[in-house]
Amino acid sequence: HAIIRKLLESPKVERIYCAPGNGGISCDAQCVDINAMDKDSMVTFAKQNGIDFAVVAPDDPLAAGMVDAMEEAGIPAFGPTANAAVIESSKVFSKNLMKQYGIPTAGYEVFDDSASAIAYIEQNNTFPIVVKADGLALGKGVIIAENLQAAKDAVQSIMEDKIFGQSGNKIVVEEFITGPEVSVLAFTDGKTLKPMVSSKDHKRALDNDKGL
C-alpha cells in the first residue's frame, strides 16, 4: 500500500491496478481478483489493460518468475528476475554465496536429510542454535532452538512434518549470534545503486520475543 501511495504522487501515473489488493488499497488503486502467483492471468490482464509498468513486490511471485513473464511479454517490470531472486528464496544459496565471496556470515552447515542434521547438532552440542528452512516461509522459516530437544523438534517439524512445505526439503543449521539486526535495502538497475534508509524488522510474532 505504501508503494502504491508513493507511485500516485508521480504526475506520470494515471491509474494503478493491484492484484489481489485489499480493502485499504481499494481506496487508492483498483483491486483485481487475480492470484499473485498466476503469471499467465497477470500477463493477460496487463496486456488487455495497456499496462505500461509492472511492480512485483512479494517474494513468492518474484521467485516464481513474475518479472521474467512480464518482460517476456514486453511489459517493463520492477523487481528481480527469478535467477536474481534466488538470493532471497534460498537460504542455502545465499549462505553459500556469502561464503564463496568472503562476506561475513554466521557459521553454518547445510543438510538435506533430518538424521544427518540431528547427528551434527548432537555432535556440535552448542545452544542456542538456529534451524532455518531453505525456501520461502512467509518470514517464519527460522527457529531458534534453546536446547537439544528443541533443535530436534525443529528439524523434525521442518524436514519431516513439512510445516513449511517444500521449503523445508533442505535446512541450514546456523551458529546463533547476538546483536541488533538491521536491514539495508537499495534500488539498482545493475549499474547504479540507490540505498534506502536502514530499518529494523521485529521477527517474533508475539510480545517479549515470544513466538515464531
What are these model-predicted stretches?
Residues 193-212:
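ATP-dependent carboxylate/phosphate-activation module, predominantly the ATP-grasp catalytic core
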Residues 104-107, 126-130, 145-183, 187, ...:
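Conserved ATP-binding module of the ATP-grasp superfamily
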Residues 1-82, 115:
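ATP-binding N-terminal substructure of ATP-dependent carboxylate-amine bond-forming enzymes
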Residues 188-192:
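Short acidic-glycine loop/turn motifs at beta-strand connectors
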Residues 27-29, 43, 86-92, 206-208:
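Short, charged, surface-exposed secondary-structure boundary motifs
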